[in-house]
Design a protein with these regions (language model features):
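A short, hydrophobic/aromatic-rich structural module that often spans a beta strand
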Residues: 54-58, 247, 257, 364-374
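Short, flexible/disordered secondary-structure transition segments
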Residues: 29, 33, 37, 42, ...
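C-terminal engagement/docking regions of AAA+ P-loop ATPases
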Residues: 3-7, 295, 300-307, 317-374
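Generic hydrophobic alpha-helical segments
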Residues: 25, 35-38, 116, 229, ...
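AAA+ P-loop ATPase mechanoenzymes
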Residues: 1-108, 113-116
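Ser/Thr-centered flexible coil motifs
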Residues: 69, 75-76, 267, 286, ...
Length: 374
């Protein structure tokens, strides 16, 4: 009873009043939250990313690629955004057998990186034999750096995050730092974990006074979380980067990547191995001289050799289409088609080589001193 005003409220009236106020507050809260979500242009992308991340984590939990299950309800929204970039090794078709001419690099990578992860008990008594915190693959374009990363993801059977650095840049102040922090907090929860950054020079290039404040803060935080004062030395979180411009990387980044592997242009012997690997399942004529092609293709990368063989294979299909009418090859089944199409000949490879040599001359990717002046 309110004696001064002479107005009294029964217990039921007070309860109804509180219920109404609570209902209005709840409606206002959820309405405001819905409006904020609608105003956020990345809301749909975030929702899809979280859904994909949950599917990937559930898929990995059913395999041996996670040492222990992760409670997805305990992951933050930012960690779920990063988890969207987790790679399932079963989805990768590249293995060590698909890489030719880099046996020394692969063997060293297995011994210094993969073995300490897979057989951790063998290296527990020494800090010197622990897996490095950073790995740098550098060399000319098209020489197999990304293929090595793919094969590593498949063969290590550990959590592998293919980090898209564009996700770390956000227009809202402070969001980039939260996402950067989520990269490492998620990796620690999923360890052992490898974080792969392709074209790492575009993200962690040398710092200077021209850097934007947000970019400089993000780089500093990334390095601090990677190997800083509060970094747990027992954590098995490895950063693997690939670049063809190692000179552009910050010195502090190079210090954090002690395991460096130069993936250079293949020599004649390596080119022969690459050509044999590319053509091993292709129909080739008896006159094909792989050794001669390997000798001619100096300064060609593995990617160039792949394109050379692809063009040569296209020539034989083109000849088939020229000698057969449309009605003829539309009604032809697969077996008859493969019997009718001729194999790849030496002439196809030489024609493809001349075409690619001309293209490389115009783009400046073939040394003038190496040209054959007929």
């Amino acid at each position: 009873m309110n004696v001064a005003d002479g107005v009294g409220y029964s217990r039921s009236e007070v309860f109804v009043l509180v219920a109404r106020v609570s209902f209005v507050a709840a409606v206002g809260f959820f309405s405001m939250k819905w409006i904020m979500n609608q105003l956020d242009p990345t809301n749909n992308a975030k929702r899809k990313a979280k859904k994909k991340a949950r599917e990937q984590l559930r898929k990995l939990a059913k395999t041996d690629n996670l040492l222990w299950s992760v409670d997805m309800d305990q992951l933050t929204d930012y960690e779920m955004m990063i988890a969207n970039h987790i790679v399932d090794p079963t989805d990768i078709r590249v293995s060590w057998e698909n890489i030719a001419g880099l046996e020394n690099v692969i063997q060293e990578l297995k011994e210094t990186v993969i073995l300490p992860i897979q057989r951790k008990e063998l290296f527990e008594d020494s800090q010197l034999t622990q897996a490095p915190k950073g790995i740098l693959l550098h060399g000319p374009p098209g020489c197999g750096k990304t293929m090595i990363a793919k094969a590593t993801a498949k063969e290590t059977k550990t959590c592998f995050i293919n980090l898209d650095v564009s996700i770390l840049t956000d227009k809202w102040y402070g969001e980039s730092q939260k996402l950067t922090s989520a990269v490492f907090s998620l990796a620690v929860k999923l360890q052992p974990c490898i974080i792969f950054i392709d074209e790492i020079d575009s993200f962690l290039r040398a710092r200077n006074s021209q850097d934007h404040e947000a970019t400089a803060m993000m780089k500093a935080q990334f390095m601090s979380l990677w190997d800083g004062l509060i970094t747990d030395p027992s954590c098995t979180v490895i950063i693997m980067g690939a670049t063809n411009r190692p000179q552009d990387l910050d010195r502090a980044i190079l210090r954090r990547m002690p395991a460096t592997f130069h993936i250079g242009l293949p020599n004649e012997s390596q080119r022969m191995q690459v050509l044999k690997l590319i053509l091993q399942h292709e129909p080739i004529a008896e006159n094909v001289d792989i050794a001669k092609i390997a000798k001619m293709t100096e300064n060609f990368s593995g990617s160039d050799l792949q394109e050379l063989c692809r063009n040569a294979s296209v020539y034989r299909v083109r000849d088939y289409l020229r000698t057969h009418t449309q009605d003829t090859y539309i009604g032809t089944d697969d077996e008859e088609y493969h019997d009718a199409v001729r194999p790849i000949t030496m002439e196809d490879l030489l024609t493809s080589y001349k075409k690619m040599k001309t293209s490389k001359i115009h783009t400046g990717t073939l040394g003038i001193a190496k040209l054959e002046l007929d």
